[in-house]
Amino acid sequence: MSPTIQFFLAAAVFMLIHISVMAVCARAFGITVRSISYGVGPTLLTRGTIHVKLFPVAGNVVLKDTREETLYDDDPCLDAYNFQPLWKQVLLPLSGVAALLALSLGIMGTPGWHSFIAAFGQIIDGALAPLSVAQQLLGEGETFARTHGFALVFALFALKLCAFNLLPFAGLNGGQALLAIARAGRPFAAWEATLAKWMLLPGLAMMLAWAAALAVYCWRALGL
């Protein structure tokens, strides 16, 4: 199996597990799930609250949340995410990553733990040097995919994405958990929207840097 196909499948499996675990945990916690989206882009299939989209590389779980929607005055909001105890507000966004981390470490063992710890520095270093450090890291990833089976490739890929999702930026699981801690379990805070916007910028910059690095790597690989 080519590295490209392996990484594409790994991304799809990661997304499926990540989103599913968060949705299951939300319902187990008694939180109303408004919608579950697997993938991005045009919707291919809708079944109840579940939406399957064209590109299986991301997804999201939309929860009942008074910060995002207007509810009836007589609604006690006991099933709203932001009215849950602090531990639920922190644990829920981390649940998908925790499940994937446990699965990946189970596949790779001790070397997987070292890969996970190293991923934080690699993500930052690669974003700061997309034409050098990132190219080297992408090359190492391709070499690993060419010399190992899909299970190990998925585990390594998942460990790197788990590390990325734990970074303290808005829109990522780590940022969501951090904002919940900063609110100290309160349903909302006046400063939260402003802080979230500032927390979003470095995450976007990092993603754009890695997207550019990947584009350059593919361009060079094709000999263009």
How should each PLM-predicted stretch be described?
Residues 2-17, 148-162:
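Membrane-embedded alpha-helical segments that form the functional core of polytopic membrane enzymes
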Residues 3-73, 167-170, 176, 180-181:
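Small-residue-rich helix-interface/hinge motifs
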Residues 15-20, 24, 105, 162, ...:
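Transmembrane alpha-helix boundary/anchor motif
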Residues 26, 30-34, 111-115, 172, ...:
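Perimembrane helix-loop junctions in membrane proteins
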Residues 73-160, 184-210, 214, 221-222:
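Functional transmembrane alpha-helices
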Residues 86, 173-174:
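Alpha-helical structural motif
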Residues 158-172:
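Transmembrane alpha-helix interface/packing and boundary motifs in multi-pass membrane proteins
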Residues 167, 178-180, 213-216, 224:
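Membrane-embedded alpha-helical bundles that constitute the cytochrome b-like, heme-associated redox core
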